[in-house]
Amino acid sequence: MLTHANWQEPNINFQVDEMYRGALEVLRWSYQEYGNEIVYACSFGIEGIVLIDLISKVKPNATIVFLDTDVHFKETYETIRRVKEKYPQLNIVMKKSALTLEQQAAQYGEELWKSDPNQCCAIRKIKPLHEALSGTKAWISGLRREQSPTRQQTNFLNRDDKFKSIKVCPLIHWTWKDVWRYVSKNNLPYNPLHDQGYPSIGCEHCTKPAFTMDDLRSGRWQGSGKTECGLHE
């Protein structure tokens, strides 16, 4: 089994087919390799919807972890409800921070997402994912190379030093058009905020409509110089 501890660049030739761009083959390999020791950390954005549908074809009872920061859009929670209805066999885990918003405010001050967004992400996303990945060997992410300059070197299989894990990224060759074409063709439920200028959706306080569709993440942490929550750095 390929793990963080024994990592070497895998000599696996995944075929980038026309229909799935390699994603389905990567998922089949991943669940065969890791079984129940792999989870999908999903934000329920549009890429996440595609991956959930693909995962359901490979492992209908797969574990999907949503990092519930308690400050997501109501549309995001409604999307999760609709996904649960469509895929009742999936094990969707709502993973929260150990600190409530009230406890966080008492310890770090009100509106930490403004005063120190990195600390806020660490408390409400990074630490909870560390906890969710405890006992697993790998996790799946919806990263695409097209999303941002920081993601252009992402491979199907990546050694993740932050979480001491293998990060599997099946959608690296998918374009924005590929994603939407798949969602439309298969009539999949998705977050309606995508139709309102939000190509990338995170917490409500830190997500605005994108400045430009040339930078799909330009609506995240606007004005802060921050482009990633820390999960993929």
Swiss-Prot record:
Residues bound to [4Fe-4S] cluster: 120-121, 203, 206
Cofactor note: Binds 1 [4Fe-4S] cluster per subunit.
Assigned EC number: 1.8.4.10
Reactions that this protein is recorded to catalyse: [thioredoxin]-disulfide + sulfite + AMP + 2 H(+) = adenosine 5'-phosphosulfate + [thioredoxin]-dithiol
Gene3D superfamilies to which the protein is assigned, alphabetical: HUPs (3.40.50.620)
Enzyme class, broadest EC rank: oxidoreductase
Cofactor entry: [4Fe-4S] cluster
GO terms assigned for molecular function: 4 iron, 4 sulfur cluster binding; adenylyl-sulfate reductase (thioredoxin) activity; metal ion binding; phosphoadenylyl-sulfate reductase (thioredoxin) activity
CDD domains: PAPS_reductase
GO biological process: cysteine biosynthetic process; hydrogen sulfide biosynthetic process; sulfate assimilation, phosphoadenylyl sulfate reduction by phosphoadenylyl-sulfate reductase (thioredoxin)
GO cellular component, one term: cytoplasm
Keyword Electron transport: no
Pathway(s) served: Sulfur metabolism; hydrogen sulfide biosynthesis; sulfite from sulfate
Active site (catalytic residues): 229 (nucleophile)
InterPro entries, A to Z: APS_reductase, PAPS/APS_Rdtase, PAPS_reduct_dom, Rossmann-like_a/b/a_fold
Annotated compartments: Cytoplasm
UniProtKB keywords: Cytoplasm, Iron, Iron-sulfur, Metal-binding, Oxidoreductase
Pfam families per the UniProt record, alphabetical: PAPS_reduct
Family (UniProt): Belongs to the PAPS reductase family. CysH subfamily.
Function field: Catalyzes the formation of sulfite from adenosine 5'-phosphosulfate (APS) using thioredoxin as an electron donor.
Protein name, entry field: Adenosine 5'-phosphosulfate reductase
Organism: Lysinibacillus sphaericus (strain C3-41)
